[in-house]
Amino acid sequence: MENLPFPLKLLSASSLNAPSSTPWVLDIFLTLVFALGFFFLLLPYLSYFRCDDPPSPSPGKRKCPVGRRRRPRGRMKNHSLRAGRECRRGLEETSDLLSQLQSLLGPHLDKGDFGQLSGPDPPGEVGERAPDGASQSSHEPMEDAAPILSPLASPDPQAKHPQDLASTPSPGPMTTSVSSLSASQPPEPSLPLEHPSPEPPALFPHPPHTPDPLACSLPPPKGFTAPPLRDSTLITPSHCDSVAFPLGTVPQSLSPHEDLVASVPAISGLGGSNSHVSASSRWQETARTSCAFNSSVQQDHLSRHPPETCQMEAGSLFLLSSDGQNVVGIQVTETAKVNIWEEKENVGSFTNRMTPEKHLNSLRNLAKSLDAEQDTTNPKPFWNMGENSKQLPGPQKLSDPRLWQESFWKNYSQLFWGLPSLHSESLVANAWVTDRSYTLQSPPFLFNEMSNVCPIQRETTMSPLLFQAQPLSHLGPECQPFISSTPQFRPTPMAQAEAQAHLQSSFPVLSPAFPSLIQNTGVACPASQNKVQALSLPETQHPEWPLLRRQLEGRLALPSRVQKSQDVFSVSTPNLPQESLTSILPENFPVSPELRRQLEQHIKKWIIQHWGNLGRIQESLDLMQLRDESPGTSQAKGKPSPWQSSMSTGEGSKEAQKVKFQLERDPCPHLGQILGETPQNLSRDMKSFPRKVLGVTSEELERNLRKPLRSDSGSDLLRCTERTHIENILKAHMGRNLGQTNEGLIPVCVRRSWLAVNQALPVSNTHVKTSNLAAPKSGKACVNTAQVLSFLEPCTQQGLGAHIVRFWAKHRWGLPLRVLKPIQCFKLEKVSSLSLTQLAGPSSATCESGAGSEVEVDMFLRKPPMASLRKQVLTKASDHMPESLLASSPAWKQFQRAPRGIPSWNDHEPLKPPPAGQEGRWPSKPLTYSLTGSIQQSRSLGAQSSKAGETREAVPQCRVPLETCMLANLQATSEDVHGFEAPGTSKSSLHPRVSVSQDPRKLCLMEEVVNEFEPGMATKSETQPQVCAAVVLLPDGQASVVPHASENLVSQVPQGHLQSMPTGNMRASQELHDLMAARRSKLVHEEPRNPNCQGSCKSQRPMFPPIHKSEKSRKPNLEKHEERLEGLRTPQLTPVRKTEDTHQDEGVQLLPSKKQPPSVSPFGENIKQIFQWIFSKKKSKPAPVTAESQKTVKNRSRVYSSSAEAQGLMTAVGQMLDEKMSLCHARHASKVNQHKQKFQAPVCGFPCNHRHLFYSEHGRILSYAASSQQATLKSQGCPNRDRQIRNQQPLKSVRCNNEQWGLRHPQILHPKKAVSPVSPPQHWPKTSGASSHHHHCPRHCLLWEGI
């Protein structure tokens, strides 16, 4: 008895020493007295509440306490409402209590017995506490009961919200719940269940979720009041919700009514289980007392009190009615049943403090005593211990479940905080409470959940994991939930020790499978004490856990398959704990052993799958690393190869296959670096590879690599087996081949993959070659190149890859650039139309070269296939148009063969100093675009058009951008050459040159843009005769305009110059400078001057006064004039009419021939003779051009090889010039004012701004016409070239004559003043015919007269 807790000792002594009848009667009467006292105590509160209640009609009850009137009315009203509700509840409970007492006492109780029952008290410890309860007068118990029963109606803050009562701390230690108990206390279950006190649902806001038979096993009435207990917390609002009876703590010596008396501490102590303070103390005290309580105490107690006493006491229920005795029997029987079941469940929890055999013996003795007690009692209405003990494998088979369910759901539906069920360990904890308290708070009890705390004595150093994670999620003292279908589950001490040993290692295992477990896991006992550690699975905060549990149970249909997977798991992951059965699941997991084993096997399988995912992630990382280092390098350094690293994670076969295909198809630009470190001599390696040693293994390995994994089908066992097999194979294979790989040998599988790549070499190489011009849209070419050239050095492959990337980027941006170029051109402010015409007209070389250079450029620029067709149509149009335009021209027929004597320039050699007669002429030939309205203009184009044909043949792929750049460079060079005039001298010597040198980019852009508009120009050009004029720079630096075919745009530029100027501009400039300096030194009247645009116009005007008014020919087309003026905007010569150009050729080209050396070009001398003859003829009178003169010129052109033919040519040219100049002056008189107002610029002054007045369309038409004429005149180039050398000697005489003519005209021999045929020299005298007009150049006059 020394180890028996104080309450139990008190109860045992009181129950054994007191008479059987007196305690019952006394307790019943005391209870009645307390109920009445509680009622009277509530009367003042009722009157106060009715006073505050407006609907109350009673005026007598409106008298409220004076002290309470000072409180705010709103506060008093709220308080009154709450107190009224509580008072009504108390009254209802009191009435129910009285009715229950009356039914229990029946006729055995009268008023005379009331006073007698309040006197006697048992001696001993109980007697010491008697003054607190039974020894007091009838009035005192009423007063003392007030704090016990009245709080229901008291204004205490705890009553403010009934649902918060569960969270309030208990008034005092739970040991006080049994302090006033005596032997005279009646058993609690003596009250009938037929008359329960309806507990207000407000106090218990959480209804039960699931009916539990155990919850229905002991449903005591809530309104039941014990004997007067001042310190008891029996019926206080914070404890009345936890009324329960102890299960498994009743000593065998106690009779049924004494067992119920012993349950009073449970009734009083459970009230604060929701309270954190009371629950904490109760938790700690339970741990202390549970360790001290053992079976020896029970055995000693049984030895001192034989069962006969119990039987006698059981048969002494004479005061109870039959219903009361039935209730007592039912409750005692269920208590014993629950004790037996609890002992079975807790047998593993008491292993350290008491052996299961000793505890089972005590329970067995208790069952036997109860059975004997039942046999001796008369009524056995509901229970038979012998039968029920055999039929109770678990709490689900309790006797008469209908009665318990009915009583529970009807009267106590909200008894236990709304939790699913009342767990027995909560009652056990309250029954084992001692007066010792702990400072460390324990979590509240949980019901119908697994327990993670063993009912052993705890220290203040309890693991805080229980209390820090989730206070409401941890379990109470250990007991198994009632969900097991096999009650034979008993965790062995070995399993518990294993659970304790592997608890820490189970956390990482459970982390992927059960993420909710870690949050709710608590270590109940420190590991240093070798206590059982378990996991908690709270249902209250994780309601999905039952569903998960059912799902896990349902997925265990294949235990054999899971067993195999477990075996595989033990092989593939040997680092896991071998004894991980209890580490995966807690020892208290509510399943049978068989189901537990299957569940753990399933969890292991799930973990294996999860680790497989982690392995895949690791393999993907290895693959990423594989791209940065080759297999040979990683193996040579002693590191595990990427395949080995991928095999180690369990997915080797699949990832190795990926690696293999990645090596074959990986578009990574660094693939060349990976392959660059492999052996270079593949043939030698393949021959020297030891196939006999590695052949079988490698082939098997390759088959395994190509074999699809069956893990996708869900066969985990096969997947694991295959993975292990492949891993072993690969490890052996890689270990065997490691040295060979380092020596430069290649495994069979790698060799085969390389062979496949080598077989694809021709295709890949072809693709790369064809994509050089096609500009691939993706990087496949780079990849194929790297694979094909994998044997190259890494640096070489990098350079090649960089080149291919640049090439690919260049072609990718080709089309956008082609679109941006025209946009930039049109956005330029008043872009030069002449540059457009110059660049627009495709050179004869471009037209003739066909698909040679143009197709190549088209592919480079990604032109559509129609580009070639467009070029073909353009070439055909060019072939046919000149014939229709020039067929009716007698002059053209006459001068078709005239250029035979003109020497041709070197077609393929670099720039060389041309003959003296041609030195100053060729730079101006790109300025030869012109549209004229007369076919007669072609008569002066014979020589130059023939020479254009020769140049076209010599330069088949010459492009206009080169011409433009060359012209710009020449202009910059001409500034240093005093006698040299740049291509822009058609209007002024300075302004056109500046335009070219400042914006050569525009010219290049315009050329490329015009090429895009060539088809649109074809139709417009076919209906217009096209004759161009060229500025001929004579040896002394003077410039003249010579009409010629528009094809001379490119043809008149020397091939050598075109080839050398883009790269050797300075060389050409120096040569030109030397030539011009030599020519100027040989001229007598020559003086170096700066070119002036106004000088040429003034110097030329005196020569044409008679012609200015002589003739009125047809009005030129406005479009033609605009195109002529358009030419002034670029370095090239503006389009002019044939008369004006011819006149300039006559008047300007003859001037510098005075002191030409014999080496001067015969063509230049011939031109000088022509102009000399014309001007000599003009002195007398300008003669109109007649048909006879044209025929004469035509006949003389046939014998052009002689000087007489040259003289005839000069005569014809002079007649043509006279006619055109007269037309120019006649039209100019009536239109000059209109021109001035329209353009707001001088017609002939510097700078001439006509170049800003025209549009690009005219230039495109002009360019197309020029290209057409070039194509036609191609055939005439070769014979003219042959005749050039033969005609050089006869032309020398003409040169001499020109020199003599120049002596007669000293005023026009100044080279600097006659530089520009557009702007006359300023020192020229003005004629009377031009006095009324602006100073202008004859060419501009011709251009403006038709507007």
Swiss-Prot record:
Residues 60-82 have a biased composition (Basic residues). The chain crosses the membrane at residues 23-43. Residues 55-87, 106-233, 373-397, 628-657, 900-955, 1084-1161, 1313-1335 are annotated as: Disordered. GO terms for cellular component: membrane. The keyword Transmembrane helix applies. It is a single-pass membrane protein. Pfam families: DUF4599, FAM75. Residues 198-211 have a biased composition (Pro residues). One of its GO terms (biological process) is cell differentiation. InterPro entries: SPATA31, SPATA31F3-like. Keywords: Differentiation, Membrane, Spermatogenesis, Transmembrane, Transmembrane helix. Residues 1108-1127, 1137-1146 have a biased composition (Basic and acidic residues). It is found in: Membrane. Residues 165-178, 631-651, 927-948 have a biased composition (Polar residues). Belongs to the SPATA31 family. May play a role in spermatogenesis. PANTHER family: ACROSOME-SPECIFIC PROTEIN (PTHR21859), SPERMATOGENESIS-ASSOCIATED PROTEIN 31A1-RELATED (PTHR21859:SF55). This is Spermatogenesis-associated protein 31A5.
